[in-house]
Amino acid sequence: EPDSVELSTVGGWVATNASGMKKNRYGNIEDIVENINLVSPKGVVKQIKPISRGSIGFKPQNILFGSEGNIGIITKVILKIHEIPNSQKYNSVIFKDWNDGIGFMKELSKTNYIPASVRLVDNIQFRFGQALKPRPEGFKKYKSKIEKFFVTKVKGFDPDKMCAVTVVMEGTSSEVNYQEKNITKLAKKHRGVIGGSGNGKRGYMLTYAIAYVRDFAARYQIMGETMETTVPWSKIQDVIDATTKKLEILHQENNLPGKPYISYRIPQIYHTGVCIYFMLGISVKGVSDPEEKFSKIEHSMRKV
C-alpha cells in the first residue's frame, strides 16, 4: 500500500522497487511478487512459474526490481494476496521533541510488536497537519482546547518542538490488542502522550492528500518535491542537518524569494536503520527559468 497508490501502477512499483506504508506486516514489493512479464526490445521475458526460494544461483526476476524502464516495460505482475485483517486500529503519540521520538522508534524496531505501519513526523509536518484539520465546533471545540492545555501546560510540551508518531495496527483482535498495549507502554517510557485514533487516521489521510497540496501550492508559484534515503540509526541527525543546511545555501546562491520549506519524517524502520522522507518547497515568484533552477537544486539535494 504505497503512498502513491491512487496515482501509480503495479508495474511502476516493481520498476522503482517501491515500498509501502504497511511493509512491516506485508513486506516490500519484492516480498509479494510471484511472477513478472516484461517486454524488451529483444522480445518478451516471461517467468514460467513462481520461485519461492532457491539455494542455487539467484532469482532472475530480482534484476527487474528497480530497473526503472532500462530493461523494458513491465506488462504483467502476479502478486501474493492476504486476507483482509479482522481488526484494524489507528493510534498516535505526541512526543516532547524529535529525539524522544527517535528513541521510541529505535526501541520499537527491536521488539516483537511492530505494527503494520508506524511513522514519526517532525515538528513542521506535525504543525502542517494540524493546520489542515477541519475547524472543531461545539463539544469538539472545547475538547480540543482541553487537550491542547493538557499537552502544552500540564505536560510542558513546546508547540514549536513537539513531534508525533502515527500508528496503524492490523491483524487478529488479540494481535492488535497486544501491539496497542505494548506500544502505549513504550510511548510512556519515552515521555510520549497518547493522541488517539482520530489524529492517527488523519495523519495518514494527509499522506494521500499531499499531491493535491502540491498542485494547490503551484498556483502560487511554489515548486515542491519529495525525496527519501535510508540511513543507519546513528546517522539520522547528520543527514537531516546536512540536507537542511544545503537547501538554505542553495536558496541563497540562487537568490530565491522568501524562505525555503523543508520537513521530514521517518516512514519506515528497520533493525539497522530508517528511511527518511523529505518534503521541500521553494517560492519561484518572479524567478527566471524556475524549472531549470529547481532541477539543479533538486539534484544537488539528492547528492547530499
Question: Could you say what each language-model-derived stretch is?
Answer:
Residues 35, 300-301:
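Generic recognition of well-ordered alpha-helical segments
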Residues 106-300:
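C-terminal substrate-recognition/cap domain of FAD-linked oxidoreductases
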Residues 70-77, 148-153, 301-304:
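Structured alpha-helical segments in the cores of large, soluble enzyme domains
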Residues 1-121:
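FAD-binding subdomain of flavoenzyme oxidoreductases
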